[in-house]
Amino acid sequence: MTAAHDRSENQPGRPGGETTAPYGSAPRRRRVRTRHLLELKQRGEAWPMLTSYDMYTARIFDEAGIPVLLVGDSAANNVYGYDTTVPVTVEELIPLVRAVTRGARSALVVADLPFGSYEASPEQALATAVRFMKEGGAHAVKLEGGRPFARHVEALVNAGIPVMGHIGFTPQSEHTLGGYRVQGRGEQAEELAADARALQDAGAFAVVLEMVSSDSAKRVTAELTIPTVGIGAGPECDAQVLVWTDMAGMNTGRTARFVKRYADLGGTLARAAQEFADEVRGGAFPAPEHSFE
């Protein structure tokens, strides 16, 4: 069967016809569709994906030309302060999805199905996914797991809901996997490939490969006709995703080996807050130009 693809007009060039522009200056662009991502794979063009949990980052990333935004269950750590992704709920994620869809004018917004909201049955998965689509305005959903969840993916796709798969290291199952361990090595390579094929056959439009050996990721990417999205899976995947707080340096603690920091936003905010505090205490703010007669 084929993935659930949208039926908008063909767009040339980058997905949705978007262009990179400074924040606040980008023209309105057409919505990125799942088939645009497939076209990029067919042309051999890599594409980026970032997480987003609010309207401001969604708008900034959208205008920077990021074609896919993931409202991940990583909000558990990065918004709500939980130690793992396990505690976050559907009720906590839906408002974040709603905010991101308001901020993103052209990016495809994917909502994570959190732990406990889909595993029991395809019917449970469908009910949860429908909530994210109707209440959150998501354009697609993501769920973790391989062959045991192919039926869940098929049920969603048959209902018209695009699905992104997620295999390799799956954070919701970290206790079963024995902690954060690289997947797809040795005998696991065939298991990983079988999971990827099952998700594709069920209709997934893409599959995330997390903390997977580069060789296994290269093999899976070559075997699949749908895009692979790597996070700690080497350079051969069709796309790459990072958690935005890691990418931008908001997380000042230790990060995973696969993370590259492109900014020191945490330090910038800390310095701005300190300067504000110093000016308030010293009487420099508010100045006359910040006051009314």
Curated annotation (Swiss-Prot):
Gene Ontology CC annotations of this record: cytoplasm
GO molecular function annotations of the record: 3-methyl-2-oxobutanoate hydroxymethyltransferase activity; magnesium ion binding
Catalytic site positions: E210 (proton acceptor)
Residues where Mg(2+) binds: D73, D112, E144
Localization per Swiss-Prot or TrEMBL: Cytoplasm
Cofactor(s) demanded: Mg(2+)
Residues the entry annotates as binding 3-methyl-2-oxobutanoate: D73, S74, D112, K142
Pathway listed: Cofactor biosynthesis; (R)-pantothenate biosynthesis; (R)-pantoate from 3-methyl-2-oxobutanoate: step 1/2
Keyword Cytoplasm: yes
Keywords noted in UniProt: Cytoplasm, Magnesium, Metal-binding, Pantothenate biosynthesis, Transferase
Keyword Magnesium attached: yes
Stretches for region Disordered: 1-29
Record's function text: Catalyzes the reversible reaction in which hydroxymethyl group from 5,10-methylenetetrahydrofolate is transferred onto alpha-ketoisovalerate to form ketopantoate.
NCBIfam families (UniProt xref): panB, PRK00311.1
Subunit structure: Homodecamer; pentamer of dimers.
UniProt-listed HAMAP family: PanB
PANTHER family membership: 3-METHYL-2-OXOBUTANOATE HYDROXYMETHYLTRANSFERASE (PTHR20881:SF0)
Protein name: 3-methyl-2-oxobutanoate hydroxymethyltransferase
Organism from which the protein derives: Saccharopolyspora erythraea (strain ATCC 11635 / DSM 40517 / JCM 4748 / NBRC 13426 / NCIMB 8594 / NRRL 2338)
